[in-house]
């Protein structure tokens, strides 16, 4: 989905300002940390550390909180004409897609957690 949004953005001639790019980069960083946490859990399935699982859930909450903050700020920025409405739409599509990646990551961690608890 992300490549589709980027292609549509480019085809429509929509431009992002530096703030939007910075926020997208920030969200990518959060998701990257989440992937790292998931990989850490996956790397030691025989001895899953509960602290690593908890850290994954904390990262997911951070992703959700950032998404909520960016969504609220997006409405304010569009209303304040800080950037165009269409820019805000594509921006939020990208942020939502990245947040969904966080959801997929936590689904993997949920499965590992459930297996870990069933073995105890």
Regions inferred by a protein language model and the residue ranges of each:
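Cytosolic, long alpha-helical scaffolding segments
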Residues: 1-120
């Amino acid at each position: 989905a992300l490549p589709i949004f980027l292609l549509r953005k480019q085809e429509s001639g929509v431009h992002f300002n530096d703030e939007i790019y910075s926020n997208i980069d920030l969200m990518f960083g959060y998701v990257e940390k989440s992937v790292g946490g998931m990989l850490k859990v996956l790397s030691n399935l025989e001895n899953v550390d509960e602290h690593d699982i908890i850290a994954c859930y904390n990262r997911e909450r951070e992703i959700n909180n950032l998404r909520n903050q960016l969504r609220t700020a997006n409405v304010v920025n569009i209303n304040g004409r800080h950037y165009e409405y269409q820019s805000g739409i594509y921006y939020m599509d990208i942020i939502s897609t990245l947040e969904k990646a966080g959801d997929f990551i936590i689904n993997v961690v949920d499965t590992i957690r459930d297996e870990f608890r069933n073995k105890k």
